[in-house]
């Protein structure tokens, strides 16, 4: 019996070390950033069981077998649709401003289509204005409404939007609603999901959280887009979830969430529609390719029209494109670079691009919330401040609530607005969307919004920052080391 237990003990030890060696080899064989690989190895060797379980759950990008097969199957028809769209030459911009030219070329070559012109844009900075505009557009909808949100939180004005959407479905408008399973857990536990389905709305719970499948699909891969398309002509996107900030996370101690949304009319709705179509097919297996733009209603010839490129990210979409777009935008800046984000945990490449811009004379400003709802990200972001301040970057800490807007403005003309945070999760993991806008008028509007944010912020003083307590520096460096995993 003693011999038996000895053999079992040695087999357990051997299996344990073989498992660690196998995971270590897998980490080393994957082409990933060195800091990320080192962080995973440290966790695995300090806390082996916890580290191995964490790596198998979150260390690699698994969409899941069924969704991955759908993603592969949809691309032939999607590629044909994109190729057919190129025949609508009148919707594509032929020229761009000097500051936007490189970025638009990058997007065209990576995604297969160019930027579309003749769009009308409106920036909405108040949640009530967003909800009221959306309700009006839903009430006027005649054919179809598609929505996707990370969070739908019942209560307040969000319920009014839900009522208008159900009314549209009852009068014959084809309504589709896709919500992230983790972000919208309160919605799916409420009566609203059943009420909407009973009204005729197709409601889909995207990337459903299932602990039984934790090793088969990465559970922290989330559907983070916020998009609305109405009648293939009107579109919305930006940082705002379908929540009323007067009711949302009031106990978090960070104040009301401050967001920005763009309302658009024009052919950009078609390019956003194909993104939604891909998401819908990956999640449901059903193909809903949007129709081409209607020449009779698009304001193609209007001189005031905005030129827009839509960048989508996530499994099945061009890899690393949003990260490349941010780098290209930073290196294109000659005079001003203003960034707004709630979560700032940049890659080394993006950090260097921002610092380099400041060091070559560009006026660089980053606007972040002073209080953050994520303790981990809040501390990790502080670890980058010293390097940014030394390079001459201005860091503004917003004090009017949780600044949730995600925006970049380059030289007052090139704008990036959407759902992407400047952190690892948005850059390389989640399903995200960003609008790239080449227009000085829109840039002026965005600059006014950012100036308002700055007026409600406190400029971080470099000398005072360097005198912060030692314990804060230690905590910052600890979270900085694990920043590749956040």
From Swiss-Prot:
Subcellular location per UniProt equals: Cell inner membrane
Picking any one GO biological process from the record gives: cardiolipin biosynthetic process
Query: Which residues does the entry assign to the active site, renumbered to this chain?
Result: 224, 226, 231, 404, 406, 411
PLD phosphodiesterase domain boundaries: 219-246, 399-426
Q: Matching Gene3D superfamilies, A to Z?
A: Endonuclease Chain A
The membrane topology term of the UniProt record is: Multi-pass membrane protein
Look up the coiled coil feature and give its residue ranges: none
* Main localization (coarse): membrane
Q: Which Pfam families match?
A: PLDc_2, PLDc_N
Reaction it catalyzes: 2 a 1,2-diacyl-sn-glycero-3-phospho-(1'-sn-glycerol) = a cardiolipin + glycerol
Q: What are this entry's molecular-function GO terms?
A: cardiolipin synthase activity
Which PROSITE patterns did the record assign? PLD
On whether Transport is a keyword of this UniProt record, the answer is: no
UniProt-listed Enzyme Commission number(s): 2.7.8.-
Q: Which GO terms describe its cellular component?
A: plasma membrane
- Membrane-crossing segments per the record: 3-23, 38-58
Q: What's this chain's function?
A: Catalyzes the reversible phosphatidyl group transfer from one phosphatidylglycerol molecule to another to form cardiolipin (CL) (diphosphatidylglycerol) and glycerol.
UniProt-listed NCBIfam families = bac_cardiolipin
Q: Which family does it belong to?
A: Belongs to the phospholipase D family. Cardiolipin synthase subfamily. ClsA sub-subfamily.
Q: Which HAMAP family match?
A: Cardiolipin_synth_ClsA (MF_00190)
Protein name (Swiss-Prot/TrEMBL):
Cardiolipin synthase A
Q: What is the lineage of its organism?
A: Bacteria, Pseudomonadati, Pseudomonadota, Gammaproteobacteria, Enterobacterales
């Amino acid at each position: 019996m003693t011999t038996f237990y000895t053999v079992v003990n040695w087999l357990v030890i051997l299996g344990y070390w073989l498992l660690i060696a196998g995971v270590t080899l897998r980490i080393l064989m994957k082409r990933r950033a060195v800091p990320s690989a080192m962080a995973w190895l440290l966790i695995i060797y300090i806390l082996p069981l916890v580290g191995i379980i964490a790596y198998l759950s979150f260390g690699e990008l698994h969409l899941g077998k069924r969704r991955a097969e759908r993603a592969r199957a949809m691309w032939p028809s999607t590629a044909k649709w994109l190729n057919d769209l190129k025949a609508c030459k009148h919707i594509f911009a032929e020229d761009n401003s000097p500051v936007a030219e490189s970025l638009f070329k990058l997007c065209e070559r990576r995604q297969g289509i160019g930027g579309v012109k003749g769009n009308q844009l409106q920036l909405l900075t108040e949640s009530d204005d967003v909800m009221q505009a959306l309700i009006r557009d839903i009430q006027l909808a005649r054919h179809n409404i598609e929505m996707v949100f990370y969070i739908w939180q019942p209560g307040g004005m969000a319920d009014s939007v839900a009522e208008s959407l159900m009314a549209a479905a009852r009068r014959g408008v084809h309504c589709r609603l896709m919500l992230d399973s983790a972000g919208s857990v309160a919605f799916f536990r409420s009566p609203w999901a059943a009420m909407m389905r009973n009204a005729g709305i197709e409601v889909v719970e995207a990337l459903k959280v299932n602990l039984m499948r934790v090793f088969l699909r990465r559970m922290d891969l989330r559907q983070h887009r916020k998009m609305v398309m109405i009648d293939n002509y009107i579109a919305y996107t930006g940082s705002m979830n379908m929540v009323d900030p007067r009711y949302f996370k009031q106990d978090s101690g960070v104040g009301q969430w401050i967001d920005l949304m763009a309302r658009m009319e024009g052919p950009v709705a078609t390019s956003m529609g194909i993104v939604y179509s891909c998401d819908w097919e990956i999640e449901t297996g059903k193909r809903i390719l949007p129709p081409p733009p209607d020449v009779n209603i698009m304001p193609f010839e209007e001189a005031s029209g905005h030129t827009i490129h839509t960048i989508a990210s996530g499994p099945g979409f061009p890899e690393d494109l949003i990260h490349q777009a941010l780098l290209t935008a930073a290196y294109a800046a000659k005079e001003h670079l203003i960034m707004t984000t709630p979560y700032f945990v940049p890659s080394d490449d993006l950090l260097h691009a921002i610092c380099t811009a400041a060091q070559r004379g560009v006026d660089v400003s980053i606007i972040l919330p002073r209080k953050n709802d994520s303790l981990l990200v809040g501390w990790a972001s502080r670890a980058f401040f010293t390097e940014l301040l030394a390079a001459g970057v201005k860091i503004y800490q917003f004090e009017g609530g949780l600044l949730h807007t995600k925006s970049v403005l380059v030289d007052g003309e090139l704008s990036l607005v959407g759902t992407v945070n400047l952190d690892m999760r948005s850059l390389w993991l989640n399903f995200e969307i960003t609008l790239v806008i080449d227009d000085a008028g829109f840039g002026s509007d965005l600059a006014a919004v950012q100036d308002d944010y700055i007026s409600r912020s406190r400029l971080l003083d470099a000398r005072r920052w360097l005198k912060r307590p030692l314990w804060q520096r230690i905590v910052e460096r600890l979270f900085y080391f694990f920043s590749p995993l956040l």
